[in-house]
Amino acid sequence: MDFRAALEQLKAALQRPLPGAGAHRLTAPRPPRQWPAGFDQANIRHAAGLLLLFPVDDRAHIVLTVRADTLGRHGGQVSLPGGVVEPGETFEAAALREAQEEIGIASGPVRIVGALTPIDIPVSAFRLHPIVGAIDERPVMRPSDDEVAAILEVPVDRLLDPASLIETERLRIRHRFGLRSE
């Protein structure tokens, strides 16, 4: 998809009401994860991620990261560059700061286009606020070795192609334990 056309289409879509949880269900794990019984939602931690739109050979792309395996519960997962919102920080500022920390993108040339519906992540008690940004040229990206295993540049037309959306079942068993020496 042409970068300028994708950007205009996205701007127009962000002027309408967002589809919210219905859109999330299309790609959510089955069964969808819920907040644990008795969980006090006042304890939700807020995070922000940058959904950055940029051109590669005039085709619209977004950037995703593969998180370093050393990063707790979400290590090895594909994600938006992003992280915890610091006290007094806006979601937009947090998304830009985290993108700079994780993939080395300077925030100056990034234009904030809007925000998508927040996504709850019960396993780690986070609510992720996706912030949409755009930049007019392919950014130079350098992954933070501590946080990012790989940077993925994903063509938007692949994401919009129904043939790219496949349903799979995946089982991942992960257990950490420590060893003591005497």
Regions found by a protein language model. Give the residues of each.
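N-terminal leader/linker segments that precede catalytic domains of diphosphate-processing enzymes
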Residues: 1-79, 84-101, 105-139, 148, ...
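Acidic, glycine-rich loop-and-strand cores that form catalytic or ligand-binding grooves
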Residues: 141-167
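Acidic, negatively charged sequence signal
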Residues: 165-176
